[in-house]
Amino acid sequence: MLASKLYSPTLRELPADAVVMSHKYMLKAGMMRKIANGTYAYLPLAFRAIEKVKKIIREEINKTGAQEILMPIVQPSEIWQKTGRWAVYGEEMFKLQDRHGRDYCLAPTHEELVTTLVSMDTSSYKQLPVSVYQIQNKYRDEKRPRFGLMRSREFIMKDGYTFDMDQEGLDKQYKLMYDAYWRIFTRCGLKFRPVIADSGAIGGNASHEFEVLADSGEADIVYCEDCDFAANIEAVDPKTIPCDIRNDKAKEIVETPGQHTIEMVCNFLNADVKQSVKAVVYKLDDTVVLAMVRGDHEVNEVKLQNIYGAINVDMASEEDLERCGLTAGYISPIGLKKVKNFDIICDKTVMEMQDACCGANEKDKHYIHVNPARDFGDVKVDTIRQIQEGDVCPHCGGKIVITKGIEVGQVFKLGTKYSEALGATYLDNNGKSHPMVMGCYGIGVTRTVAASIEQNHDDDGIIWPVAIAPYEVVIVPANNKSEEVMDAAKKLYDAMEEKADEVVLDDRNERAGIKFKDADLIGYPVRVTIGKKWQQSGNVEIRLRRSGETIEVPYEECKAKVMEILAELHEKNQ
């Protein structure tokens, strides 16, 4: 490819909504352009990187025995209503009607459709297992699309589905896919960690996420320093913390004028925040839920949602608080009257506390000397707090560490949730009917590209892993005015026939400094410079983007050296 012909219009000024580095660099390097909020057009450089990720995915998923198919993006509402997810997806689902008034959606995922599809022609145990996948666009009406390809409304995804006779068969398929995902992300040159995950709206009884480790990640990843435990923070039940304080005093109301936050109250009462109880009030579908955690803890909202089986999770409104007899800033379960569609739940650690302080449900007043197990009355008790850095590992008792990650893939053991709802059954060798046991397996293709940039960049631009770099090599003639320099660059370019589709010749009529700057921005793994040194000594300069290492070799040996370097980069997945 000649750089003069490459369609990659660079930007000098970036839009204000370009916050993360992948978004900034993909816009600046002319890799994509925003069409609407959350939707992007992929220009040649981004398209090539995306296609390379797809190629790796296909190679590894095909090894598992899965077969590629392609399913419709437009899906009828009926199949979603059978599983109950027409309502569950809520406003995130793009919904539309045809001219006859029939309801459809733009596919956010394909569990319903693939289950319906497989059930049409699969009825016997002799036809199982079935393993299929596709790579295509998905659509989710994100409330706040942001971070470029990290959270967009239209994105490219690989989604796979397996159908088995029993749990044992599913376990085998799950292991095959888990191992394939490990190979895929390794080949993409990513530093990642598989973690235990919550199944979310898709459902199922087991799930793992594959998280790319990056400071810009939206996910909090919990792992243990002493064992191999790792999980998304939302999927962890932390251990209950015992209380070593003993108190027999009766609870007492004290004046706390203007003290309406945990920090303010604890400072006013000269109390440790660990001896306070925090109240957070949610609206879970139609039910107002008062959640109580220790003052230094946060509520695990995903766990809370799962406990109540809620579709929508919002903060309670002022009207909700008033209806339930709650005074904002001074809330507690003590003395509350029973109200319809109102529930109280306390974290297990709270129920271990003694001599605590909490709200009194009156403005400017709090309780002290509270023993929640004694004073809170009939409340629901469960583990609803979020695990924190330094907590005890729930598996081995070691120390918990929390880092940031970008989810690029997830695997699920779905079980029979969809097959039962949609009638996907088979007959065993005795003629008895059973629901198929399903698994599903997703990879965010465009998100993988963005995550790679988040993990691999510096102040000058992108540092692509060679396997997914749009091009692997750029040849830069540093002196455009010299015909012999240009001729030498073209001859080297022509000689790279084994890598003809992976080499760019920067033949633009630009200064060498601009070419070098663009090469670093775009992130070519290898740059070959032919200039004054070649004219003076016959040597050319090879520079590695990742390490910054520069190697001088005779012109005649350049091709062989570049091929050697590329082979080494591929072998090391760098």
PLM-predicted stretches and their roles:
Residues 1-98, 161-200, 297:
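TRNA-binding/sensing appendages of the translation machinery
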Residues 54, 111-119, 144-160, 168-441, ...:
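Extended, low-hydrophobicity, polar/charged segments
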Residues 75-79, 320-321, 507-514:
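Short acidic loop-to-helix transition motifs that present clustered carboxylates
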Residues 87-104, 212-223:
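Acidic, His- and aromatic-enriched active-site or binding-groove loops in soluble protein domains
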Residues 265, 439-468, 472:
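C-terminal, non-catalytic macromolecule-binding modules
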Residues 461-515:
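Generic long, charged, amphipathic alpha-helical segments
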Residues 492-561:
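C-terminal structured "cap/appendage" subdomains that terminate the fold
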